[in-house]
Amino acid sequence: MKLHNYTIMPLDTDHLEEICEDIKHQYENGTATCALFMMTLVPEGNPPVDKVGILCKKYDLFRDRLAEMGLGSGVLLQASIGHGWVLSEMYPYQSYTGIDSGDTVRVVCPYDEGFRDYIKHAFTVIASHKPDTIMLDDDFRLLSARLGGCGCPLHVARFNELWGEGASFTREEISAMLDDPGEIGDRANEIFIYTQHEAMIDCARLMREGSDSVDPSLPGTFCCVGNNVECAAEIAEILAGEGNPRVVRLNNGHYTQPCNHNFSNVFRNAAESIAKLRERVDVILAETDTCPQNRYSTSAMSLHTHFTGTLLEGARGAKHWITRLHAWEPESGAAYRRILGKYCGFYEALADIVPHLHHRGCCIPVTGTPQFDRRKVSGGSGGWSNCVLERMGLPFFFAAEPSGIVCLDGAADAIYSDKQMESVLSGNVFLASDTAKRLIDRGFGDDLGVDIRDWTGKQPSYEMLPYRNNECSVQCGIRELVPMSDAVIEHSTVYHSVSRVNPERLFPGATVYNNARGGKAFVFCGTPNVHYSLTTSFSFLNQSRKQQLIDMMRMAGQLPAYYAGDEEVYFRAANVDDGSLFCAVFNLGMDPIDAITLGCETVPQKMEMLDCDGTRKAVAFTVNEEAKTVTVDTPAYTLAPVILFLS
């Protein structure tokens, strides 16, 4: 199936011919399937300047020239209520007002009737200029990445109307009510969240009415912000138009990053969003933004890795920002076009494989339920994935349905009800001590095999790991693990010592327990979730700890394959419906891998690699029977993902 790949283009009439030729090239080489011309329509001036009229005249020139070339195009409404940037002149409409601070920002409240007329007119005008599609950008939001929600006079009035009983609460009073732990807080959050969503959804309906007045079949798509995908499914359905797929671009951008650490967070964000959208929309797009669209911000290989990893989570295309929009610098986009064109077949083949994958290894849980009540935890944690697993070459994945080894730290357990947690604990779990303490407080202590206590004794000096009896620094956030059964296995030990003389055992560093539910609980005395630094990270980031995790994953039956070296590798493993084993190798480090060495549960008889054109080609490999490793005769360069099939 073809992917939905959009490319954002400027309405730069001084370079009309060059831009149209570029679009033709992008279509022909597989970079994009639809070009969207950017229109920034956040109102400015009093009365507002007729931006849509001015920009549509420019659009006509591009539309007509592309039509002569047999090509289509659409429009990106890049700003509607506004991203909050400085405006040349203020508009005459109600501004967004933070519910807590009372601060106003340069964003329009979509409850404002004048603005609603303005934006409906804009959609009507755009539709009359006959684009192939209209995409609404991600400034159209109120709760996500804003000041806690809009508490402007219009929203306060609507809140009071819905509360009833002649209510006349002030913004400050509503803000306080939202934090109330009891029934008042429950009702206040329900009504407040409703007002935020109502303002957006009603405004989106007016946008669609504008399009429908010209062409009810004109497709529309939506870009959301935040892992809670604020109203995204509802808005996408409204904007889609008669008989068209519901399309949402999720929010997982990765531009202006100082390094490749935490790259997996891009994919966790995608997984969080897709878990909430999967059954409600038809097409999900990656946010492959390179803002401000040059390689000083985002390398072409970073873009390639980003797109590849997001396809693995279930995306079926992307909104590519690969063209400088405010300067004529076509050189800045050349490398992006080369990589996306070269791998277009790879992306399509990978997207087609994804529905047939059954992931193995460590499971980083995400939630399929949006949570806007600020009193509650809205998602899991990326401590295990960001801080440990994405660098160790051990297989892990993101999922709303727990399987494999569920990895929890901090308050991540809060995404599960008690009944769900019973199910989780009937399987395999990696628990940081802070999460284990929370589970004990919830009544699940018998499932863990240990009690968790604050340590008030002698200073922990080091932890001894089973691999070669090597020592490492103590874990951060350390607590005492107290075994409550002889069946608890002490997998590593924390010691006190002065200059390594006469070491004194303090307590376990990690334990293993087979509980009565049939599950296996691995509890660590600290947490992996730390800021990357010399003094915090390297209790987990070392080869001896990696070997401990390998042993534990084998005990859980969740290690079909892993990357055996010490390069920083993000690794995925999954059983495929055809009986083969799928492996994805993402080299996130700066050192090239000349040949990929995998530890394998079962030695393969055959190995194939997904080529850039989407075909599979056989690759040579050698087997080390003693080490149970397989060395694949193919390199893995930095940010150049390698997809393998073992059978």
Task: Describe each model-derived feature in a short phrase.
Residues 4-14, 41-56, 101-117, 184-202, ...:
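The substrate-binding groove and active-site-proximal loops of carbohydrate-active enzymes
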Residues 17-43, 128-133, 305-317, 388-398:
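Catalytic domains of carbohydrate-active enzymes, especially glycoside hydrolases
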Residues 72-129, 138, 142-146, 163-194, ...:
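Active-site-adjacent "subsite" loops/lids of carbohydrate-active enzymes
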Residues 22-24, 40-91:
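Aromatic-lined substrate-binding rim segments of carbohydrate-active enzymes
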Residues 381, 386, 391, 398-401, ...:
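A conserved amphipathic helix/loop scaffold
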Residues 30, 38-40, 132, 143-146, ...:
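Hydrophobic targeting/anchoring helices
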Residues 12-28, 113-126, 232-238, 299-308:
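Short, acidic/polar
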Residues 119, 126, 134, 211, ...:
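Conserved, mostly hydrophobic/aromatic
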